[in-house]
Amino acid sequence: MLDIKFLRTNFEEVKAKLQHRGEDLTDFGRFEELDTRRRELLVQTEELKSKRNEVSQQISVLKREKKDAEALILEMREVGEKVKDLDNELRTVEEDLERLMLSIPNIPHESAPVGETEDDNVVARTWGEVKEFNFEPKPHWDLATDLGILDFERAGKVTGSRFVFYKGAGARLERALISFMLDLHTDEHGYEEVLPPYMVNRASMTGTGQLPKFEEDAFRIESEDYFLIPTAEVPVTNMHRDEILNKEQLPIRYAAFSSCFRSEAGSAGRDTRGLIRQHQFNKVELVKFVKPEDSYEELEKLTNDAERVLQLLELPYRVMSMCTGDLGFTAAKKYDIEVWIPSYGTYREISSCSNFEAFQARRANIRFRREPNGKPEHVHTLNGSGLAIGRTVAAILENYQQEDGTIIIPEVLRPYMGGKTVIK
C-alpha cells in the first residue's frame, strides 16, 4: 500500500510512474474524489459534534435554572441525526478509499527498466556455459518417467493435472536439494531457518499483497476462510505483522522451506507437462526486514545468495532486471534468475528476488524505531526464492543427463544422496 499523504501531495507524479506499469488506472482517478470527500466529512462531523456538545451544555444550564429547553433539545436531536448520517457516509467513503488503496500497485524504482512486457526485461548478467550435447537431449519428464523417479500419471489419477509423485531417487533428490539450500543459506549466508504454517488467514494474504487483487489465484478453505500459502513469503512476512521492531534487530533474515499451492488460473495450456508449473511444489524462500536506507544493497545480496545455489550446482543461468510492466503488483524492483533448460532451448525462471520497499510493511503494519522513544517508521521488506525445488530438479535432470538416460548427480549434492554419483 502506498503512503496516502505522499499520494495526496504527489498525485500526478505517482500517476505518471504507475502508467509505466501498463496498469488500468481508471479507478486510480477516484482517489482525489474520495480523499477530498473523506476530509470534508471529517471536518463537518467534528464541527457538528462540537456544536452538539455546546448545545448539550446549554440545555444543562437551562434545566438547572428551571427554564424551557425544548427548542434546544429538538435542535440537538437534529444535529444528532445529521452526525449519524455523516458518520454513515464517512464509513462508506473510508471503505471505498481503503479498497482503492489496496488495489493500487507499488511505484517502480527509478532503476527499473521502463517497458511493457517480458520482451523489455534487461539481462543483468549471465553465468556458466550452456552445455552442448552430442546426442538429442530428452525433456525431464521423459527422463524421470523412464528412470521411475517421477510419476505424473498416477498423480493425475489420485488428484488431477499439474501434480506429481516423487519416488526413490527422485524423492531423495528433492530432499537433498531442500537440505542443501537450507544449510547454505543458514550456515553461510546468515539466515535464520523458519518452518511456517501452510495455511494463513485473510489478513496475512492482504498484508503481502495477494489479496484482494489475486484471490482467484489462491486455494481457499471456505469453511475457515483460510488460504493455502502460494509462497512462504506470506506467513514469514506476517510473522511481524502489527509489530514495532528495534533498529538493533534489523536486518532480520529468514530462510523458510514450505510447500506452495497455486491455482495457475491464467496458465491454461502453458507448461502442461513436467515440473515447471505445478499446483503444489516445494520452495526455499528468503525473506528480509531491513532499514529503508539499506534495502537496495540487501536486494543485491539476496539475489547473490540465490545465485550461489546455482553456481554450486554448476547450472548455467542469467539474471534479468524486470521492466516496469513486468514487475508484478508489489515489487518496486525485481530480478528474475532464469536457469537454462535444454528441452526448452531457453532460460526459465527459477527465482524472483524483489524489494517491496514499504509497500508490504504499510499493509501489514510492520514498523521499527531508530531510538527507544522515537517515532515508528515502516521497515522495507524483501524476498526471493532460494530456490524453487521442482524447477531445480528439472534443471538438474536435463543438464546432467547422459546419452544412456542416466543422470550424473551434482558433486555438491552427493553427501546428501548417500554418496551416490549417478541416478540410474
Swiss-Prot record:
One of its GO terms (biological process) is seryl-tRNA aminoacylation. Homodimer. The tRNA molecule binds across the dimer. Belongs to the class-II aminoacyl-tRNA synthetase family. Type-1 seryl-tRNA synthetase subfamily. It is found in: Cytoplasm. The gene is serS. Catalyzes the attachment of serine to tRNA(Ser). Is also able to aminoacylate tRNA(Sec) with serine, to form the misacylated tRNA L-seryl-tRNA(Sec), which will be further converted into selenocysteinyl-tRNA(Sec). GO terms for cellular component: cytoplasm. InterPro entries: aa-tRNA-synt_IIb (IPR002314), aa-tRNA-synth_II (IPR006195), aa-tRNA-synth_II/BPL/LPL (IPR045864), Ser-tRNA-ligase_type_1 (IPR002317), Ser-tRNA-synth_1_N (IPR015866), SerRS_1_N_sf (IPR042103), SerRS_core (IPR033729), tRNA-bd_arm (IPR010978). The keyword Protein biosynthesis applies. It comes from Bacillus cereus (strain ZK / E33L). L-serine binds at T231, A232, E233, E285, S385. SUPFAM superfamilies: Class II aaRS and biotin synthetases, tRNA-binding arm. This is Serine--tRNA ligase. The keyword ATP-binding applies. Its EC number is 6.1.1.11. GO terms for molecular function: ATP binding; catalytic activity, acting on a protein; serine-tRNA ligase activity; transferase activity. Pathway: Aminoacyl-tRNA biosynthesis; selenocysteinyl-tRNA(Sec) biosynthesis; L-seryl-tRNA(Sec) from L-serine and tRNA(Sec): step 1/1. Consists of two distinct domains, a catalytic core and a N-terminal extension that is involved in tRNA binding. CDD domains: SerRS_core. Transmembrane segments: none annotated.
